[in-house]
Amino acid sequence: MSQVIRTLALTGLALAGLSGCVSVPRGQGGAAPAVVGQVSESARQAEAARQAWLQAHPAWSFQGRVAISKGRDGGSGRLDWQQDGPRYHVQLSAPVTRQSWVLTGDTTTGAGRLEGLDGGPRAGADAEQVLLEATGWTIPVNQMPDWVRALRIADAGAARVDLDEHGRPRTVQQDGWTIDFLEWTPASAAQPELPRRIEARNGDAKVRLLVDQWTLSP
């Protein structure tokens, strides 16, 4: 999960425009899962099955609310992420100001295009560089699809991952960030468990994501 939490920093595109637009409730789902020192073999197998299922279903989307703060600056908005294999289409909107930004790209090629900025769209062979030049944030968008589903990233380098009793990631510490998976959407006949509420912090930078709805293609 190398650096993935910074992906949500794309909301820094419009902290002023998003300020106060959408609330992201804290802890509305009850107590967060506890970190455990040992995980049962059945839990490990269940988590391995969850990840295998998600890897086999690369077309998915989620809608939710995101809030980001950096020191005294902060804002919130609605986030609509659509993924089809390596291709993604991400829309961030501020309902009150009616502002919106769209990021599209391909995790295979790394290219991306950002729309909704003053001065017109920006595009380039490196989506991360496009976002860096537009916002000042380093955002590894190619890792976001794995991270938001709490999938392990095999080639991401060393990371500390604490698990809950179900074998799922509970807290991840890497590259200065502490990422907490605080609530999960229960499994259904159509999909396995998926993260619902995630909070992260790195110094005075904080990000909160609340997923209202997951949709996965058969």
Curated annotation (Swiss-Prot):
Record membrane topology: Lipid-anchor
Signal peptide boundaries: 1-20
GO cellular component, as recorded: cell outer membrane
SUPFAM superfamilies according to UniProt: Prokaryotic lipoproteins and lipoprotein localization factors (SSF89392)
Cell compartments where the protein resides: Cell outer membrane
Keywords, sorted A to Z: Cell outer membrane, Chaperone, Lipoprotein, Membrane, Palmitate, Protein transport, Signal, Transport
Keyword Cytoplasm: no
Lipidation (N-palmitoyl cysteine): 21
Keyword Lipid metabolism in record: no
Lipidation residue positions, type S-diacylglycerol cysteine: 21
GO process annotations (BP): lipoprotein localization to outer membrane; protein transport
InterPro entries assigned: LolA/LolB/LppX, OM_lipoprot_LolB
Protein family per UniProt: Belongs to the LolB family.
Functional summary from the UniProt entry: Plays a critical role in the incorporation of lipoproteins in the outer membrane after they are released by the LolA protein.
NCBIfam families: lolB (TIGR00548)
Subunit (UniProt): Monomer.
HAMAP family (alphabetical): LolB
Name of the protein in question: Outer-membrane lipoprotein LolB
Lineage: Bacteria, Pseudomonadati, Pseudomonadota, Gammaproteobacteria, Lysobacterales
